[in-house]
Design a protein with these regions (language model features):
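Zinc-dependent deaminase
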Residues: 1-15, 31, 61, 75-182
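Short beta-strand scaffold segments in enzyme catalytic cores
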Residues: 21-26, 150-151
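Short glycine-/small-residue motifs
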Residues: 34
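A short, polar/charged loop-to-alpha-helix boundary motif
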Residues: 39-51, 168-175
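Mobile, glycine- and charge-enriched loop segments
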Residues: 50-75
Length: 184
């Protein structure tokens, strides 16, 4: 699951209102496919992992799938991931966190179980939920996750006495802040 979480982070900043999700396929104790949700409107992590698996010449049937968020079970910009998992013959799905989106909310897990797929929930759950705190906030409130940053001088000012604009922080600090805002 930790590898799936690492992969999920690669999508941060590109998925807009969608969650960041990573997926890893394991068969006979070796990784046979990996994927993550790369961009809004693109393939979800599960489908990316299945495509990667097949591109390696591997067969996903009977494999275990580790995914940081419950697979979707509805049609949106892409078909349901549960459908792809079922059709691939995955035998066991390990889920990090339940998707609280009302379009999913446990239904993805239920669909997999109804098809005879073993599902283990809550693997590194707190970490997976934290990874998608921005997504969960948006789903629960329909409001953006707001984070603010400002710089000030040692005496608490944000501009010179004349009001003239000038940099308060150095270039390295500005770069660091830019990167930290992407990786909330």
């Amino acid at each position: 699951m930790r590898r799936a979480m690492e992969l999920a982070e690669l999508g941060r900043g590109w998925t807009k209102t969608n969650p960041v999700v990573g997926a890893v396929l394991v068969k006979e104790d070796r990784i046979i496919g990996e994927g993550y949700h790369k961009k809004f409107g693109g393939l979800h992590a599960e489908r990316e992992a299945l495509a990667d698996c097949r591109s390696r010449g591997e067969d996903p049937a009977g494999a275990d799938l580790y995914v940081t968020l419950e697979p979707c079970c509805h049609y949106g910009k892409t078909p349901p991931c549960t459908q792809a998992v079922i059709e691939a013959g995955i035998s066991h799905v390990f889920v990090g966190a339940e998707d609280i989106n009302p379009l999913v909310a446990g239904a993805g897990i239920r669909q997999l179980r109804e098809q005879g797929i073993l599902v283990t929930e809550g693997v590194l759950q707190e970490e997976c939920e934290y990874q998608n705190r921005v997504f969960f906030h948006y789903i629960q409130t329909k409001l953006p996750y707001v984070r603010m940053k400002y710089a000030m001088t040692l005496d608490g000012k944000i501009a010179s006495a004349s009001g003239k604009s000038q940099w308060i922080t150095g270039e390295a600090a500005r770069e660091q802040v830019h990167l930290s805002l992407i990786h909330i």
